[in-house]
């Protein structure tokens, strides 16, 4: 048997589709291209498909991953078995617009699961004031400088305590250790009401930190829009790498049509 790791995007209107529904889309795509998936044993066998970290509904991503197990050998040269290099194009043609395979690679036996292995994610999003929020500093000429100062304050702090709600219960967490990087990118428009693009690398252990929690640290009156996950990172020998490129750095295949189909 062979295991193959696939990178894919989730862009456009399909970002409102749940993680479970996206999983069903993939199962249908695998059937359409007639991939020989391995199945679990038992009364109700299921295809051996393992997804990485769930993407919150409403968020986009250009760095989603899943692993599949095949009952036949997967090859990089296409001379026998499954031609992995051709998989992204075949799968993208069988998937709805907005979900596209962008790379595929055979992974080595014993490779940790995505759920276990991903240590952090990079996110980009727009920060804007919540409707009705009182943010006097945001409407001044120095709003960009003020936001930059708040980002610097978070990065220089030894502790960043925020309150979040989980299942109706308020929880208090120190999230500073989970913020690897945080930076301002550029205004999202000519007017402050359009917001500011931010980018951050946030850890996934002991739990996954979200951009919304970072905004609470900057100002509770801010909210996120246009959230996109741009990278997932694993650690190898003290260095971070992308999950798919770790096994065979030179063998990744790309599907440049992905962004076009989602637009």
Where do the protein language model's features map onto the residues?
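N-terminal, Lys/Arg- and Ser/Thr-rich interaction peptides
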Residues: 1-6
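N-terminal ordered "arm"
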Residues: 11-39
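Core RNA-modification/binding signature centered on pseudouridine synthases
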Residues: 145-263
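Short beta-strand-to-loop capping motifs
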Residues: 8, 68-76, 125-131, 200-206
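Short amphipathic alpha-helices in soluble, non-transmembrane regions
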Residues: 78-95, 137-157, 214-215
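Short, charge-patterned binding micro-sites
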Residues: 38-73
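Ordered, amphipathic secondary-structure segments that act as subunit-interaction surfaces
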Residues: 62-124
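A short, aromatic/hydrophobic, helix- or strand-capping loop or linear motif
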Residues: 36-44, 102-106, 161-168, 227-230
């Amino acid at each position: 048997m062979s295991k193959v790791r696939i990178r894919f995007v989730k862009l456009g209107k399909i970002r409102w589709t749940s993680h479970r529904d996206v999983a069903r889309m993939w199962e249908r795509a695998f059937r359409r291209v007639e991939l020989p998936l391995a199945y679990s044993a038992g009364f109700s066998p299921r295809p051996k498909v393992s997804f990485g970290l769930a993407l919150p509904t409403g968020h986009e991503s250009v760095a989603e991953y899943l692993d599949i197990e095949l009952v036949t050998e997967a090859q990089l040269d296409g001379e026998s078995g499954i031609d992995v290099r051709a998989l992204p194009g075949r799968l993208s043609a069988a998937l709805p617009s907005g979900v596209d395979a962008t790379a595929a690679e055979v992974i080595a036996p014993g490779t940790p699961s995505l759920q276990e292995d991903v240590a952090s994610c990079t996110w980009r999003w727009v920060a804007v004031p919540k409707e009705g929020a009182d943010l006097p500093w945001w409407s001044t000429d120095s709003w960009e400088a003020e936001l930059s100062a708040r980002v610097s304050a978070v990065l220089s702090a030894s502790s960043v305590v925020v309150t979040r709600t989980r299942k109706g219960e308020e929880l208090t967490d120190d999230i500073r250790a989970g913020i690897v990087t945080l930076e301002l990118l550029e205004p999202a428009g000519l007017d402050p009401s359009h917001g500011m693009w931010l980018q951050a690398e946030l850890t996934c252990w002991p739990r996954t930190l979200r951009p919304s929690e970072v905004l609470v640290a900057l100002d509770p009156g801010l909210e996120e829009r246009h959230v996109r996950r741009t990278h997932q990172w694993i650690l190898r020998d003290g260095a971070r790498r992308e999950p798919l490129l770790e096994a065979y750095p030179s063998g990744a295949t790309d599907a440049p049509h992905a962004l076009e189909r989602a637009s």
